[in-house]
Amino acid sequence: MTGCAGRRDRGTGRRLWAAGPLLCAILTLSACGGVDRFTTAPPSAGGPAKPARTVAQTPATEREHERILSSYGGAYDDPRLEALIGKTVDRLVAASDRPDQAYKVTILNSGAVNAFALPTGQLYVTRGLIALASDTSELSSVLSHEMAHVLAKHATIREDQARQAAVVTRVVTDMGNDPDLTALALAKTKLTMASFSRAQEFEADGIGVGISARARFDPYGAARFLTAMERNAALKAGKTSLDPRAQDFLSSHPATPERVQNAQNSARQFSSPEGGERDRETYLAAIDNIVYGEDPSEGFVRGRRFLHPKLGFSFAAPETFTLDNTAQAVIGVREGGTQAMRFDVVRVPSEQTLSDYLTSGWMENVEKGSAEELTING
């Protein structure tokens, strides 16, 4: 990887720093802790090329797509990466049990390490995850894992399971006013859902490894990448007091030793003497010049300082604060979690003061008497 070059296509909801007043506040907390660039289609066996299948769109999935773009900095536009991912997904689709299923892939402009799928076949992968992978087989393991969730209809099944769990909890709650009984019901519901999600992840791993292997990619790519993600999370944890998994793949795809071992066991069933394809050189050439970490056009964090070269300003957080430049705002947390800071852009009605806005529900748990006004540089 070289430099910090690349092209971005921001989705709706991304911070527009010049759009309104800038708010920065130290808040006392209450006690407690892309645009869709390319579509894959089933390959035709000889004859004229068939038109690409399109992923079914509904108002709900369109809203979810826009929400995802807003949360992850919009779509990241890189033709070389798109070409590589398109070819990879085409091979995976042909090797899957449902070669008639179409997929639409969006690269997200986020340094977080994450990937996910909508039930319709819309797949999302962040440039942070792409940068962490070492070869095409590792990327294929992530894509095939998300395809497996679609093929196994995990989202639909999980929604049904959650609905049933909610009914059980409501029935138990309505049976009486025993808070201990209600708490026990809620705890059992959470445990059931966690166990259910864990089982789905293991199933998706097994299906995904099989798809990658049949597509002639190295089936051990999944285990290698799970290990890389865990090491990456541990490295981040040593540098920040914020949860490094907040927006990352590991928040919903825990890379436990058991899961890594499961991926290795699945790979052994498909490994051959000649091994599968890793395609490292092609992969490294495709990710050359990818933006790594934060998008400099949206500002970046260095230590306790936030800098925005494009708009020509910077500020430093108080000592013991850790900053995180998210898609929505710059967030700071004091060591121990007793105080937080948010640097944001809002449109305040002309008849409302900034102090009133700060205490009107902009953030939860803001002490109304804690808002103070000051003027900086006139």
Show the residue positions of the predicted features.
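A periodicity- and composition-biased signal for non-globular, repetitive helical segments
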Residues: 13, 20-21, 265
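Bacterial N-terminal signal peptides
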Residues: 19-30
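Hydrophobic alpha-helical segments, especially transmembrane helices
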Residues: 15-16, 260
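A Zn2+-metalloprotease active-site environment signal
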Residues: 32-318, 322-378
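N-terminal secretory signal peptides that target proteins for export/translocation
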Residues: 1-14
